[in-house]
Amino acid sequence: MSSFILAIDQGTTSTRAILFNEEAKLVHYHHVEITQYFPQGGWVEHDPEEIWDSTLLCCRNVLEEASLRAADIAALGISNQRETTILWDRHTGQPLYRAIGWQDRRTVNFCEQLASQAGVLAKFVEKTGLILDPYFSCSKIKWILDNIKGAYEKAKRGELAFGTVDSYLLWKFTGGKCHATDATNASRTGLFNINQQRWDDELLTLFDIPKSLLPTVLDNCAQFGFTDLDLLGHKIPITAMIGDQQAAAVGQACIKPGMVKSTYGTGCFMLLNTGDQIIHSRNRLLATIAYRLNDTVTYGLEGSIFIAGAAVKWLRDPLHLIEKANDSESMASSVEDTGGVYLVPAFTGLGAPYWDPNARGALFGLTRNTQREHIVRAALEAVCYQSKDLVRAILNDGANLTTLRVDGGMAANNWLLQFLSDILGVNVDRSRCIESSALGTAFLAGLGAGLFDSLEEMTGLWQADRHFIPQMDPKKQEELYDGWQKAVEKTLTPAAPLLFP
């Protein structure tokens, strides 16, 4: 009997295929790094074919390494980097352009011009829960249609398909038989009305995007189709799709209102479960869909940080201050403090709660005594300060936060999580399975395949690996955070047209 679940976690810098058993225990995983392209300042792209090739390779390798066959897999689920935008030809399956990444800022001017038009901003926020920012898919689609020769005409004729990465992978897995997405990914496009749960004709007109481009929107657990026989040697049912951050919230068992998770990967994403209530933030957070099951929507309040683990990669690759990412932990702990150094990693602008697309990274407080260890520590501390920015915004929106559940690649760093607990002044719990996105995806896929009965079972499956308790004096905490706020203030650009009404 088929009893294993295959979860795809397609991220910004790598693709993973993770096998879980019927008890949602991790059995084996395989990962492949993928390339990011930076053709101009503020531009971030991927090769869609590389994304697909890496996904298929991971699936084949993880099965081989675990001595399993595709026939042993009861269900497949897909989680993905959100907002990243792909357009492809419906007949040939060929991408029209590279995938424009979620970090890409090329549409800043367009978004600012649109936001300056009377009534546009308030309407956009009310319908989508988002802000009018290059982060989301709508302006990326618009850019491709306007800048790739013949794209708009082909779209009008119904010859092109749009998808976030989940939708593109589904198309490839099913041999073009299924063009669909899920409610969480749809909610990150800027074209989906989260109140009415449908593509919004008024928003499509605003961005001049033909509706024929768009995929069908399904629940997170649904019958999305089957993998083509030729791909893995057996047709595997695809029973779940979900954006990676929402998948992590499920994997962290944040299924009750008031529960919060934070994922530390390339960026950092903090998500608060708000139940059946849409909370329009007064503090520049995003209202979004946490998950949709049986046509019932659970909403979330999210803060997005563009640069977290990417700052460590920056220390490693162009700067060569570290050899390996995990060297950052020992280097940060080897000095008592940063020596007054603050890094504001606004390499692609600043996300929540500032939403300044034109801000750029800066190092402050350098002296002749500054060592590379101080800079490395400042990079890790910056992740924690940005997290405090988000926590303050969540608290100011009326939420109560006593414990934060964390996951992602950076969550393996004990020093980082202790400093995070110290600077936030709250308990931080690290999940035993730091692959929370994959776990949440696997659980939903199993739910869709009938291996699990209800979402509540996830609560019993979640286990903490380690608890981090605040140890810093509150006065010291305030002093350090005040220095961060002053550093951020120096990087912010003159006010552009407001992105919130």
UniProtKB/Swiss-Prot annotation:
Ligand binding (sn-glycerol 3-phosphate): T12, R82, E83, Y135, D244
Residues annotated for ATP binding in this entry: T12, T13, S14, T266, G309, G409
Notes on how activity is controlled: Inhibited by fructose 1,6-bisphosphate (FBP).
InterPro entries assigned: ATPase_NBD, Carb_kinase_FGGY, Carb_kinase_FGGY_CS, FGGY_C, FGGY_N, Glycerol_kin
Gene Ontology annotations of biological process type: glycerol catabolic process; glycerol metabolic process; glycerol-3-phosphate metabolic process
Domain of life, per lineage: Bacteria
EC number: 2.7.1.30
Keyword Ribonucleoprotein attached: no
Family matches, as PROSITE patterns: FGGY_KINASES_1, FGGY_KINASES_2
Tagged with keyword Nucleotide-binding: yes
Record-listed ADP binding positions: T12, R16, T266, G309, G409, N413
Chain sites annotated for binding glycerol: R82, E83, Y135, D244, Q245
UniProt keyword terms in alphabetical order: ATP-binding, Glycerol metabolism, Kinase, Nucleotide-binding, Transferase
A Pfam family matched in the record: FGGY_N
GO terms for cellular component: cytosol
Function: Key enzyme in the regulation of glycerol uptake and metabolism. Catalyzes the phosphorylation of glycerol to yield sn-glycerol 3-phosphate.
HAMAP family assigned: Glycerol_kin
Similarity-based family: Belongs to the FGGY kinase family.
Protein name: Glycerol kinase
Species name: Coxiella burnetii (strain RSA 331 / Henzerling II)
Gene (name only): glpK
